[in-house]
């Protein structure tokens, strides 16, 4: 009986085992699924991720959108692609999956410094510029591509010199003597400029505008932070992309000069020059200066990868010939990045970026104010009777101007045509990410950033007047800088119930080294050998070397808390220790706090269906600025004074002497900016309309100032100290709308920024004068003092031309019956009331149109060029505007007489407001079915026009210029500045 029961039990166990084996075998037999992923225009989506739900089993779609994957029976597939909504479907053979475009910007991932969050969870003031925004325009400068795209970001192109960097301000100017440039962070590496970076390599840009977001970067973030993420390799099918374009550039030409007869008549009235009769027009100086410039840009990239290994490689060439002859720029760029998942818990990244860029024809050609405004004003100032070359000596430029000191624009160009600056930059970064557990990760990165530069100048001893006086001059300067950054960051993310916590702590070490050597030479025999070994005299005072270094050690932390996506709070703290400061002032602490309330998640909002998201934000924080500090500013530094050892009566054994160059100041510290921000985010109508509003108030204190003490009052006269404060406050608004979403799509993005700047206080010196105008007037036109906006113009109030005398009447401000220096007052403000940008994009069946309009309102320009071209104070030629000058008593005109009482005054202050059609781009995506036979996945020819139309009352060549470039204390000065270009661009984008 027992045996029978045992046998029955064994038979049962065997049967059960057999069933389990059969079931396991059946389960292990995966099924092969094929399908296609398309978009809403029935075009294949290349590289879309197709993942078996709940597993890591996945593939990517090929060039035709097809995929093949083996999955378990009954599995579901999850399909995702950037810019489209994720979609989940049941796995079935031959399935066709259509992805819809992602219209909800709230799910966009935003970089916030050492981390990222979704746009909907941002508690601070952050603006975004996407690769799509850059892709619609043929740009070569990454910085210029942001113009008009983000509220609170004021970008102006100070001059049109090839390769010139734009001026960027985030919420106004914060420093009088330090840098006002934002901090750039490229793939986690902080840096001061991005000239080396090709716009085609950029994937996304985030602008941290308020202190509560930027404080995580501490003492370098007072001017805002621009975080740039570059394109990385993606798993899927290999993709090769080519973007090539060619541009034709012209200049806005609105300056006309007097002809020979008109010029002689003017000179007779002034009485300084006696010209002979019968002078004839010989030269149109515009033709000798301007040309049709061109830009050619070619960018090639390759990306490929698997779920374990991904890479991205790009390279390109940019070449520009400026609209002023002999000026040019060229850049070669290369970048490679690789990402490897070595283990499930270990990911390694490595990237190398190299750029080689060269500027030629820099110096006077850019209008540095020397030689009466340089090339541009010389076009008007040079008489038309003069030839280019001296008929009696054809190797020399003509300079017989009957005793008048005039240098023709052609000679001005020759003086700088051999000026060249060449730089190469290498940025190498290695990163490792260790995942201890899903909630806990550790990131370490080490980067090396090296820039090497060579600046050479040569002025031949024959063709130019100054060259003959100096017997030719040469210069060779070499500098090299290297920056090492080592970051270590620990992140912890945990969600439990309605609560989520994101904690981060880390450290950063930065070391910078710089060195320079330079040689000046002169006395060349001819122009055949421009190198210094052909110079017979090497300057004993203009030759030398220098070096410096600095370092920062930092620790930082951030804590983010989110309850039910309704209440959010963020706290940051960073401590920076800088070698630029004395030991007892070396460390600074920069805290910030921010919070947000998603009102739309409250119960009382549930019945309001047209509101998709409503969030109120607020934040406070502190940031620093140490850019105005030299590497050893707190120490007393000494100058080396060389003693001439050669020549009769000199000691051949003479040694140099030393003198103190500045006073030490161990109390120096960095500038500190405290900022408060309140904002509102609103998304309505099914995510089709998004509105952002922000109000901010930021105050900078302990501004870095320089003072020159009276002679003999101390061991040295120069002192750097902290003293003074400045305020910026304003409003920002941004609106994005999807106006049409059918076959015809129309999207609009608009932003506008209002900023008010005021220099609140100064210590020691209460007034700083800057920006001397013409040698004849010899007065400074900028006066910075408490209570006024930075860079305000200072001078006399012009009240029109006296009909009886022809002189300009100036206002007696003091009322003492006399017009004297005490009657000078504030006459203009270069800061705009507001700046704006408006982008409209249209697309229909592959045809795409993008229109960008941007502008500025309320800013004044001091037009020093007019002082040279309408001043009538010496023997230079003038513009045709002086034909309306006063000549006889009783004449009513707004142009004074020849040789009038010219002064810095409101007569030369003009409204610099403008509205500009910055870019119009039209492109066409050739249908896939027409190009697939050639192995292509994308073919997009395009045409674009840049700076096509400018509406302005400004009489100069362009209202966007600033002679003093990136200066914070001097703005809105036009003195022969290199004009901006109008461009027509033809290009093509190809992918295969």
Identify the residue ranges that each predicted region occupies.
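A generic beta-sheet turn/junction motif
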Residues: 41-43, 52-54, 71-72, 221, ...
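Conserved C-terminal beta-signal and adjacent last beta-strands/turns
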Residues: 13, 747, 829-857, 903-951, ...
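Repeated loop/turn-to-beta-strand initiation elements of outer-membrane beta-barrel proteins
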Residues: 308-311, 345-348, 439-442, 498-501, ...
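Transmembrane beta-strand segments that form the barrel wall of outer-membrane beta-barrel proteins
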Residues: 244, 315-321, 569-578, 620
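Surface-exposed loop/interface segments of Gram-negative outer-membrane beta-barrel transport/assembly proteins
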Residues: 234-283, 323-327, 333, 337-425, ...
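Active-site phosphate-binding and catalytic loops of NTP-dependent enzymes
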Residues: 154-157, 215, 600-607, 929-932
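Short, small/polar-rich motifs associated with maturation and membrane association
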Residues: 1-335, 340-355, 364, 368-369, ...
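Residues on the lipid-exposed face of transmembrane beta-strands in outer-membrane beta-barrel proteins
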Residues: 230, 259, 300-304, 334-340, ...
